[in-house]
Amino acid sequence: MAERKYFGTDGVRGKVGQFPITPDFALKLGWAAGKVLATQGSKQVLIGKDTRISGYMLESALEAGLAAAGLSAAFTGPMPTPAIAYLTRTFRAEAGIVISASHNPYDDNGIKFFSAIGEKLPDEVEEAIEAMLDQPMDCVESAELGRASRINDAAGRYIEFCKSTFPSHLSLDGYKIVVDCANGATYHIAPNVMRELGAEVIEIGTHPNGLNINEKCGATDIKALQQVVVEAGADVGLAYDGDGDRLIMVDHLGNKVDGDQILFIIAREALCSGKLHGGVVGTLMSNMSLELALKELAIPFARANVGDRYVLEVLKEKGWKLGGENSGHIIVLDKNTTGDGIVASLEVLAAMASHKLSLNDLAKAVPLFPQVLINVRFAGGANPLDSEDVKAVAKAVEQRLAGKGRILLRKSGTEPLIRVMVECEDGALAQSCAEEISEAVKRN
């Protein structure tokens, strides 16, 4: 794969107003993508966004660039990332564009593309767009310019899709659910999905103003959700992130239920109904208790690198359908082509309704082992993980933890940091082992 100049692992991302998240670059990116996609067939591209104020600026610039290349843009307005993947497929568009920086603060933004089948663009298409970005911009003849339109019922279409994934013989009638939409893209979707399936819904994080996305709310900060669930006597709390591809849950006692526990609940339910199709993919950070719980059910488990795109890669390699991260990215390939927070929450709610069990009961099967994370800064140059001293200490710790814990040592890809993670049923032992390895890293 060629070295990338503009695209990262998840499209283009950065601070608004700084390259590449500027209106002039977005214009050029729209044009370059349009020139490449125009050779593929369809002349329509969907553009969706989350609720950041900069989304208005970037969608206009992208649309102008696409039009100059002869492609038409259809705006969905604020929509979750998985909704754009779904709508791109159903509209038979050539591509979908999402303007979002996911769980980041409002002054970040990003631009990423979906293919016609709602998946990440093939590498060769991204590389062709990168090459086109270095060419001088031109404009098609006036009669061939693209047009702009708005899909007025985009939210309704996606709401119906989400509801269709919930078993028709079940209902959420009698459930009180607190929904935290992070003041993000699910604000007008998730509460309506739950209500239309019968639930009593209490909303938080559903008043976006362009500046408050992910601010003290959503999947990355669930304190407010935990408080409201307990105070309201709710059955469950659902927290999505800014673009709706993550889910963290809260049980009726206010306990956090993370992506590993959610993944297990969905996997066990799929196994019982004969719909599992192979095993489950987690990541290097997935809790050991998830692996052990799946092993008890004889469900195969594989670990991918951290990042939902790597989970998806391993799922495709193995032909499996279910994977995710402890951060709450849950991919159910039977239902959508990318991580989908609302669909994942409906999978868990269906398990609750089907067995008449609380979320607390379902999550008990995966009592998470304590994870101790220590970031150790080093001077740069040689990688401390290559040192014989660090290797010897790590090996000794692994022997001490054999069968009851694990270690993970990673060098940061962006900073001079070594990330030390120790996981063990005994939290005090995990802490002492992590500190021992960290001291060895500091010495080297």
Curated annotation (Swiss-Prot):
InterPro entries: A-D-PHexomutase_a/b/a-I (IPR005844), A-D-PHexomutase_a/b/a-I/II/III (IPR016055), A-D-PHexomutase_a/b/a-II (IPR005845), A-D-PHexomutase_a/b/a-III (IPR005846), A-D-PHexomutase_C (IPR005843), A-D-PHexomutase_C_sf (IPR036900), A-D-PHexomutase_CS (IPR016066), Alpha-D-phosphohexomutase_SF (IPR005841). The keyword Lipoprotein does not apply. GO terms for molecular function: magnesium ion binding; phosphoglucosamine mutase activity; phosphomannomutase activity. GO terms for biological process: carbohydrate metabolic process; peptidoglycan biosynthetic process; UDP-N-acetylglucosamine biosynthetic process. Binds 1 Mg(2+) ion per subunit. It catalyses: alpha-D-glucosamine 1-phosphate = D-glucosamine 6-phosphate. GO terms for cellular component: cytosol. Its EC number is 5.4.2.10. Its cofactor is Mg(2+). The active site is at residue 102. Activated by phosphorylation. The modification Phosphoserine is found at residue 102. It holds the Pfam family PGM_PMM_I. Keywords: Isomerase, Magnesium, Metal-binding, Phosphoprotein. It is an enzyme of class 5 (isomerase). Belongs to the phosphohexose mutase family. Catalyzes the conversion of glucosamine-6-phosphate to glucosamine-1-phosphate. HAMAP family: GlmM_B. This is Phosphoglucosamine mutase. It comes from Glaesserella parasuis serovar 5 (strain SH0165) (Haemophilus parasuis).
